[in-house]
Amino acid sequence: MQIHQSAEDYLETILMLTQRMGRVRSIDVVNELGYTKASVSIAMKKLRENGYIAVDGEGNLTLLEPGREIAERIYSRHRLLTHFFVQPG
């Protein structure tokens, strides 16, 4: 399924924050990306409705398998590009 780059950015951010913090809530995404609470709330609703994330009763975000696959692919690509452009020489 084709998704927009903004959705990919949100999924990658959730993955990175999960690795760093363990638990992730929408406010963590707001703080990380600098977007408004309203924008992040709308995006999380769309990601949830499309089966990319789950939100528990405490507001914790969890990547579901389709979301995790996309996030890991994007994260891997960004790490590879960063490594390529940061190499000395």
Which residues make up each language-model segment?
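Solvent-exposed alpha-helical segments within well-ordered globular domains of core cellular machineries
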Residues: 12, 42-45, 72, 83
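Basic amphipathic alpha-helical segments that dock to polyanions
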Residues: 10, 29, 40-50
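Amphipathic alpha-helical dimerization/coiled-coil segments
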Residues: 79-89
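N-terminal helix-turn-helix DNA-binding core of bacterial DNA-binding proteins
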Residues: 2-35
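A short, conserved structural fragment
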Residues: 48-58
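Basic, amphipathic "hinge/linker" alpha-helix immediately C-terminal to the N-terminal HTH DNA-binding motif
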Residues: 59-77
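Residues at alpha-helix termini
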Residues: 33, 50, 88-89
